Curated annotation (Swiss-Prot):
Subunit field text: Forms both homodimers and heterodimers with EsxA. Homodimerization is calcium-dependent.
Role: Implements its pathogenic function during infection.
Protein's name according to its UniProt entry: Type VII secretion system extracellular protein C
Record-level GO cellular component terms: extracellular region
The organism's place on the tree of life at top rank: Bacteria
Coiled coil ranges: none
Family per similarity comment: Belongs to the EsxC family.
Compartment(s) of residence: Secreted
Signal peptide: none
Residue pairs linked by disulfide bridges in the UniProt entry: none
Amino acid sequence: MNFNDIETMVKSKFKDIKKHAEEIAHEIEVRSGYLRKAEQYKRLEFNLSIALDDVESTAKDVQTAKSSANKDSVSVKGKAPNTLYIEKRNLMKQKLEMLGEDIDKNKESLQKAKGIAGEKASEYFNKAMN
């Protein structure tokens, strides 16, 4: 074996190693991207959990307000003030009902979004690990 043969063999092996290293670097880059996405979805899921807790707290407050609105706490003598009070109370009950329905819809949307974010986080984490 002369020097040229050895040099050719070493260069060939170096090219193989270099190509393999580039493939590994690319794979690391791809998996790192998946991990970043998984982390972002986990953060989103956490933030949605906080928002969901806030919505549930608001729903409880609205439910308490609706219960309070059903109680007659004012006794006004005379027909006109009572009529005005009853109309305003009924309007308030109606608005609280609408608000309660909107809160329930928002709660459902947040729960769905949280579930999707959790699924995506798991999906990207699994892609990064496989």
